[in-house]
A protein has these predicted regions:
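Functional cation/ligand-contacting sites centered on basic and imidazole/sulfhydryl donors
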Residues: 1-4, 9-189
Length: 189
């Protein structure tokens, strides 16, 4: 066997303690976290765009941001993958669904005041419609269906009963203006 002899008892104890200790575990920072930390401001602009629009920018939108993302990360898709890896707990699909619902409510309410043609809408809204519905015709059809479903009193009552915001009375649902976004689309119409 191997014998180790020390002159001082403290050195022997130090040796024994060091040999029984687990090897130090190095903390590995994921590549996505490193990229995010290095380019936080630029990537945060992408996150802000997505939370406002519910989608990634198209090629002809936010061109400056896309150029900066290409220089920093390598492109829009790669930057989005970094965002998804860094923000694992965020439900991005819920943000997209909420923006889609907002757009449906807006289109349904525009029907009441003569809905404009597609080219009369703001460019960002046209991009949203193409992204979420594929065509203006499909979007207006779904908006009309939402508008007509708001006339179904049973559906409105069931939805009002299930509402998580506001005060429900037997014949009414009172909701503060700041909480309207938390209502189902059929109640917002």
């Amino acid at each position: 066997g191997i014998f180790v002899i020390f002159r001082e008892e403290a050195d022997a104890n130090d040796y024994l303690i060091r040999n029984r200790r687990r090897r130090s575990i190095s903390v590995k920072i994921s590549r996505a976290d490193r990229i995010y930390d290095e380019h936080r401001e630029t990537i945060d602009e992408l996150v802000e765009f997505f939370t406002q629009r519910g989608r990634l920018p198209r090629r002809d939108e936010s061109i400056d941001l896309q150029h900066r993302l290409r220089d920093a990360v390598g492109g829009l898709r790669r930057a989005w993958n970094v965002v998804r890896n860094v923000t694992e707990g965020t439900d991005w699909e819920a943000i997209t669904a909420a923006r889609c619902d907002d757009l449906l409510v807006d289109l349904a309410l525009l029907k009441l005041n003569r809905r404009p043609n597609f080219m009369a809408l703001p460019e960002a809204t046209r991009h949203d419609i193409k992204e979420f519905f594929g065509s203006y015709k499909q979007a207006t059809a779904e908006a009309d269906q939402l508008l007509f479903s708001s006339g179904n009193t049973e559906l409105v009552d069931e939805t009002a009963d299930a509402a998580t915001v506001g005060k429900r009375l037997p014949t009414a649902l009172y909701v503060h203006e700041s909480a309207l976004g938390g209502l189902a689309p059929v109640l917002r119409v």
